[in-house]
């Protein structure tokens, strides 16, 4: 998954990342990644077990390892506990996705932005949304405004996955987060306010360089929120992502039978969340790399 990709990239830049501690609820996964990387990098790698929902455990781990920065690649539900631990230890913080309550399929920056003054007073930095989208797409937009244009009024962010993993249905990142995102209402920013749409209501076609013509659908995405706040003169920001017909057909069937629900149900005397159960039976995104062929194309217009 994304954590493995990030750790590989850090290890390729050992002059900057001299030492890394990989921590997860399942330490064996960290150990396997360490073993895979040993002999390929000068970066010293340690591993640890931690529950990212437990602030005290996080504080203890940070104090033991004493890192310069915590790179949060856990679930979005865990952003705030990790930020609390960074505040308590005065450690810089980076993440790739904004906070989302586990029991509500709604993500926005307000919870994390509320930490701004606390981090400022502690003398530490929190860098939010540092993936590709959000992340690089924000850099593209800010660079264009600073160096290429006097004013930018409209931004469309397009995310095209032109790869094929050979499965009838699988997600390229955490299935639980992916399905919550694409099955939620869409929204875009226009003339100073949010416009909400039904899931997959707005569809467009676009000819992506190196990929070809693809169907894309308007989604809510967190960088719309940050760009609307930080791009003076902006009138409209939208986010589109491509999906193949097989993906959409499977998703609709799963929705129809209740498998995308986040409401707990009782099954054989145990409480389960249908979407979390679905995640357990779908292919692990970390396993898709070797069998995926094709290109991706992400950018701003």
Model feature map: region roles:
Residues 10-11:
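Aromatic pocket-lining residues of Rossmann-like dinucleotide-binding sites
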Residues 26-29:
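Helix N-cap at the beta1-alpha1 junction of Rossmann-like dinucleotide-binding domains, i.e.
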Residues 49-67, 74, 78:
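Conserved Rossmann-fold cofactor-binding substructure of NAD(P)-dependent oxidoreductases
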Residues 62, 68-72, 86, 93-94:
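N-terminal Rossmann-like NAD(P) cofactor-binding module of classical short-chain dehydrogenase/reductase
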Residues 146-301:
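C-terminal catalytic/substrate-binding lobe primarily of soluble NAD(P)-dependent oxidoreductases
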Residues 19-21:
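Short beta-strand element of Class I
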Residues 3-7:
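N-terminal Rossmann-fold NAD(P) dinucleotide-binding loop
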Residues 97-124:
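Rossmann-fold NAD(P)-binding glycine/threonine-rich loop
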């Amino acid at each position: 998954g994304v954590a493995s990709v990030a750790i590989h990239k850090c290890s390729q830049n050992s002059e900057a990342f001299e030492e890394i501690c990989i921590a997860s609820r399942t330490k064996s996964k960290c150990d396997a990644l360490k073993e895979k990387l040993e002999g390929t990098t000068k970066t010293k790698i340690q591993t640890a077990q931690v529950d990212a929902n437990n602030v005290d455990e996080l504080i203890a781990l940070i104090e033991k390892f004493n890192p310069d920065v915590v790179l949060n690649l856990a679930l979005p539900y865990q952003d705030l506990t990790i930020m609390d631990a960074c505040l308590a230890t005065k450690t810089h913080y980076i993440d790739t996705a904004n906070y989302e309550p586990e029991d509500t399929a709604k993500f926005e920056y307000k919870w994390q932005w509320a930490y701004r003054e606390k981090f400022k007073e502690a003398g530490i930095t929190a860098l939010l949304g540092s993936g590709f989208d959000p992340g690089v797409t924000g850099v593209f937009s800010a660079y264009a405004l600073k160096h290429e244009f006097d004013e930018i009024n409209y931004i469309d962010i397009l995310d095209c996955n032109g790869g094929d993993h050979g499965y009838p249905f699988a997600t390229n990142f955490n299935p639980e987060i992916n399905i919550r995102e694409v099955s939620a209402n869409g929204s875009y920013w226009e003339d100073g306010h949010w416009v909400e749409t039904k899931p997959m209501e707005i569809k467009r076609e676009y000819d992506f360089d190196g990929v070809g013509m693809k169907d894309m659908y308007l989604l809510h995405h967190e960088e719309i929120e940050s760009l609307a706040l930080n791009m003076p003169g902006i009138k409209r920001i939208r986010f589109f992502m491509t999906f193949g017909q097989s993906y959409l057909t499977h998703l609709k069937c799963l929705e129809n039978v209740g498998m995308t629900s986040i409401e707990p149900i009782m099954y054989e005397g145990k409480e389960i969340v249908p979407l979390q159960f679905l995640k357990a039976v779908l292919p692990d995104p970390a396993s898709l790399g070797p069998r995926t062929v094709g290109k991706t194309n992400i950018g701003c217009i």
